[in-house]
Amino acid sequence: MIDIHYWPTPNGKKVTIALEELDLEYKIVACNIGRGDQFSDEFLEISPNNRMPAIVDHDPLGGGDPISIFESGAIMLYLAEKTGRFFADTTRGKYDVLQWLMFQMGGVGPFFGQANHFNR
């Protein structure tokens, strides 16, 4: 089971979409950023940069103790690797996925966030 510390933001939503598409069991743990939940000591143990989403996988890839992962891109890469889906086995295929992920995270995503923020 995967706990996703979540609030309905674009980054939170893209991880829940990945969890659904990968058919993984998960439980939403609300992280109300309007109330400041992301600054709690408990949350900072999972996501030291106080940003969500973050996950705790209680049945991690490779076994062992639960693993915490923060940052939406890192989470999606982990989930893809864990399930063997959406991430190629070849160098060319991996970097085809990575370049588009970085494009979304570094370019498109921030601009969409600004468009929404300044239209309130």
Language model region names:
Residues 1-120:
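GST-like domain detector, emphasizing the conserved glutathione-binding G-site
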